[in-house]
Amino acid sequence: MGCAASKLDNEDAVRRCKDRRRLMKEAVYARHHLAAAHADYCRSLRITGSALSSFASGEPLSVSDQTPAVFLHTPPPPLSEQSPAKFVPPRFSPSPAPSSVYPPSTSPSVASSKQPSVMSTSSNRRRKQQPKPRLPHILSESSPSSSPRSERSNFMPNLYPSAYQNSTYSATPSHASSVWNWENFYPPSPPDSEFFNRKAQEKKHNSDNRFNDEDTETVRSEYDFFDTRKQKQKQFESMRNQVEEETETEREEVQCSEWEDHDHYSTTSSSDAAEEEEEDDDRESISEVGTRSEFGSTVRSNSMRRHHQQPSPMPQVYGGAEQSKYDKADDATISSGSYRGGGDIADMKMVVRHRDLKEIIDAIKENFDKAAASGEQVSQMLELGRAELDRSFSQLKKTVIHSSSLLSNLSSTWTSKPPLAVKYRIDTTALDQPNSSKSLCSTLDRLLAWEKKLYEEIKAREGFKIEHEKKLSQLQSQEYKGEDEAKLDKTKASITRLQSLIIVTSQAVTTTSTAIIRLRDTDLVPQLVELCHGFMYMWKSMHQYHETQNSIVEQVRGLINRSGKGESTSELHRQATRDLESAVSSWHSSFSSLIKFQRDFIHSVHAWFKLTLLPVCQEDAANHHKEPLDAYAFCDEWKLALDRIPDTVASEAIKSFINVVHVISAKQADEHKIKKRTESASKELEKKASSVRNLERKYYQSYSMVGVGLPESGPDNQHMLDARDPLSDKKSELAVCQRRVEEEMVKYSKAIEVTRAMTLNNLQTGLPGVFQSLTSFSALFMESLQTVCTRSYSIK
């Protein structure tokens, strides 16, 4: 048996399938650890930023006035906001919230500094039309009699205050739906006639005021819709008539919201209508580009007059430096600038200057958080999070068994009684649907199951072949010896049975091999391409944030200690230093694990892919085509890119920063030891001084008689020193202890100075090197993955 098993294992097909099974098992293992390492790396970035911020809070280091400011290159606008020759201004949302009315684009540099907002204006074009207010579905334009607006009101929807403009529909599911839940709706008592009279007077008064305001605003605005006074008068008259015609309709339609004295309404229009309206706004808002650079977090009112009153500055001129706060730092100066070239935003820079180490580290922490957030998409691809676990159970049908009845596919919360049992059964129809979303984890698990099955089938087929060869040799020997026909028939029957088993197992091998190839080409390859693009975009974003950190951290070279007397290191600050060392160590280990397991995963997949290109059966040799060759070239390019990545440089840079923090922590520990010795010596001095004072009270009954002779102890009753003072030894010991305390105090002061100087020097020399290495590594990794992604485009 041992020889037969050894011969079976030495068969090429069995050995190859065994290697395929092993490689797929290694790929599953590496993917699992890659997902964990990726999650640890993103988490370590956040923890390192927080630890740096806590450490910087205890360091009184300021940036000198001679330190030059740093220039930060802001990322380009999204492609959706650019065109080859025109720049579409941002659309204004009808929501009154400042963040949604005009959302500022944040810069990856500092926490609260805002990226200069660049808008398109033109002196000879019409103002961008503000979107129409959207009514709830029950009052929307879908009903001919329910719309309080007409085509004539498109000039300025907010020009005249009306009932529906002053009303608010809360964005609840009952109000947002097309059919209201009237059981939960309790309308108030209807208003009297005085209410409507008062509202009509207010409408008339506000309409007159709006006419005057609009006239003044139109004169000073650079977007005039009409050039003649006659056209303006006609439009105003038509709007006045419209308001008068719609008064009664508005009273009836938005009566419930007027009773509740709401100020605005919520948008409950359908998504299709919103998309059509936004497309109309996009087509109407395209204009000649005039670039304007401004800075600061501004709040837009419902009308757009404040925005249009400001003139556009000349292009290619940097805006003046303004004050921006960053974590309560009021004088962190940020200047911004942009220039116009053919209508496109060609470059934007920000000049940043921070006051102290805390502000610098907070800006670095913000970019750490952004870099960690850029890996969330890859985390989803690698199946991290609760949503991926819930997706795995989507094919299970839940049956909740209660004491009274059997409720299928119902939640246990539908009844007050707890369920007696919850049973799951698999839904086989939902397992392999063509349009169902499949994950990389499930694909690898299925491939591993198929590879195990293929190995067993190949092993069985080759075993039958070996047994078939033995039976043939036995038959030949029996025929040569001339044995009886019964034995020959028995041997022939065994040979026939083995031939049937070989045919069946060969068909099973072919079916399994085809299933593996199909799963490889339809699921695994697209998922690998998606994962590669995900890593590429992740490292591209990380490169931007690390580059920003590298620019910001240059300011630590200008740090100085403005405090005249060195402050001792508190216990809280020593703990923050230890936490920083632990965080950077975790960062280093997770970075090494991330690169290692990504290499292991791609190496395993690459080697397995190479073996799958070889046909298991000779009959399948003609079925191989070019598609897997292109996919294999993609995997091979990815493997070579990972092998060429100089991750050791970045890893050593992070490791060197661990040593830097460790040296700071060691100096703080030495300072703490000297402080303990000083405190111990001070306590001993106080104890001995107290003992001497007690003895003085006992022998002399006074503090002023120390070392002085008793009365009438000398000639002429004069006081004189007592040479036989019993406290002289105690006083000598007290003097020695006092000198030792003074020496310890001097050592403690020097230890504080050494700690402060060592901290400043290590931060200035160690911290910039980390971000320089990370910036270079992320740039090289991004470029390598871009080459791999380019190779993926050739996959059919």
From Swiss-Prot:
Which residue ranges have biased composition labelled Basic residues?
Answer: 124-135
For this UniProt record, the keywords arranged alphabetically read as follows: Coiled coil, Nucleus, Transcription, Transcription regulation
Gene Ontology annotations for the cellular component aspect, listed alphabetically: nucleus
Q: What are the BP-aspect GO terms? A: cellular response to nitrate; nitrate transmembrane transport; nitrogen compound transport; response to nitrate; response to nitrogen compound
Expression across tissues is: Highest expression levels in leaves and roots, and lowest in flowers and siliques. Also expressed in stems and seedlings. Also expressed in stromata. In flowers, expressed in the pistil, junction of filament and anther, and vascular tissue of sepals and petals. In roots, expressed in stelar cells including the pericycle, phloem and parenchyma cells. In leaves, expressed in bundle sheath, phloem and parenchyma cells of the vascular tissue.
Answer yes or no on keyword Transmembrane: no
**Keyword Transcription regulation carried by entry:** yes
Region feature Disordered, mapped onto this chain:
57-174, 190-342
Q: Where is the composition biased (Polar residues)?
A: 163-174
Q: What happens when the gene is disrupted?
A: Under high nitrate concentration, seedlings are slightly smaller and display later flowering than wild-type. Under low nitrate concentration, seedlings appear normal. Nitrate accumulation of the seedlings and roots is significantly lower than in wild-type, however no difference of nitrate accumulation in leaves. Nitrate content differences in roots and leaves may be due to the reduced expression of NPF6.3/NRT1.1 in roots and the increased expression of NPF7.2/NRT1.8 in leaves.
Residue ranges under compositional bias (Acidic residues)?
273-283
- Which cellular compartments is it found in? Nucleus
Biased segments, Basic and acidic residues type: 195-237
Q: Which InterPro entries match?
A: DUF630, DUF632
Point out the coiled-coil segments of this chain: 227-255
Give residue spans, biased composition: Low complexity: 98-118
What do we know about how this protein assembles, alone or with others?
Interacts with NLP7.
State the protein's purpose.
Required for nitrate signaling. Regulates expression of the nitrate-responsive genes NIA1, NIR1, NRT2.1 and NPF6.3/NRT1.1.
Protein name, per record: Nitrate regulatory gene2 protein
Q: Which organism is it from?
A: Arabidopsis thaliana
